[in-house]
């Protein structure tokens, strides 16, 4: 499992998939993001994902991206979720802008889904990562 290999919370991966694509493997957003984890084309290319509708490639790329964001933002779930949603450059420059309701709402939904998933995946979580997610 990619989450275990990259030391990313299984619950976080599931929360992202739930909120991004509602588990639709070939979902395409109005902005052009594709697949379960809704990878933007440039991000997919950067991660070596050739076919974003391929479940294995999409999840592998999405989990690697989350692992990278977790390192960049020191495991702060709010910043990781915001970075996943609007891009790491914007979050690195501005942090969390509480003037942007859309980003704040997305982060809140990810956190709520994460907490719910963590309760259901307690055994998987303990083996996935020892990192603390705030």
Map each language-model feature to its residues.
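Catalytic glycan-binding domains that act on GlcNAc-containing polysaccharides
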Residues: 1-134
């Amino acid at each position: 499992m990619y989450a275990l290999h990259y030391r990313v919370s299984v619950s976080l991966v599931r929360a992202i998939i739930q909120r991004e694509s509602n588990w639709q493997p070939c979902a395409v957003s109005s902005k052009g993001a594709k697949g379960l984890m809704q990878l933007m084309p440039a991000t997919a290319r950067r991660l070596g994902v050739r076919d974003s509708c391929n479940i294995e490639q999409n999840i592998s790329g999405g989990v690697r991206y989350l692992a990278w964001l977790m390192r960049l933002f020191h495991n702060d779930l709010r910043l990781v979720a915001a970075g996943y949603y609007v891009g790491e450059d914007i979050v690195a420059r501005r942090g969390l802008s509480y003037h942007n309701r859309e980003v704040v709402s997305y982060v809140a939904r990810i956190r709520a889904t994460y907490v719910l998933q963590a309760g259901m995946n307690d055994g998987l979580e303990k083996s996935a990562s020892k990192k603390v997610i705030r």
